[in-house]
Amino acid sequence: MTRPLATLPKAHLHLHFTGAMRHPTLVELAGERGIHLPEALAAAWPPRLSGTDERGWFRFQRLYDIARSVLTDEPAMFRLLRETAQDEKAEGSGWLEIQVDPSGYAGRFGGLTPTVELVLAAAHAASAATGVGIGVIIAANRTKHPLEARTLARLAGQYAGRGVIGFGLSNDERRGAARDFAAAFRIATRAGLLLTPHGGELAGPASVLS
């Protein structure tokens, strides 16, 4: 007996916060805020990108940063997670792990801790509305100093068991090897968090082993 794929139970184990945004939501929020979207975001969807070379990665990161800039207030953050949970439910997913780097939003929401609490509140509301369980992964930016990663790992540890389930590492892996952030991962390990660094995207299999 065959079953439609959408009805099969699933878990989505790694989804980036801004990257989860619906395209119509991105366009709508940008219009309301007077933010100009380049053609690659406004019309062509999904954008045609190559992440395997430096130029392609730079373009991807630029577009991602522009998309993130439309999330300027709490209602937008709540909306993003609510719509994401709705999409997950429609696809048969009962569990979502969503990754966010709080430093990308801290300037507009009053700091790292208020940003984490906002994301957790939005995740809780989205879960309650849809029945989809949501765990939050706090991620560090590998292009920044490892000390910043330690700060984020400690912050993530403070919310272990209260919605935060993991600690990650993202951005261009050619500019920051995972081993350089070992101290941050030790902090996260002591807090009982999952370790979910990106690897192998641009630097090959060796970066996964590191």
Name the predicted role of every residue range:
Residues 199:
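Cytosolic ligand/metal-binding cores
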Residues 1-193, 202-208:
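Metal-cofactor-binding active-site regions of metalloenzymes
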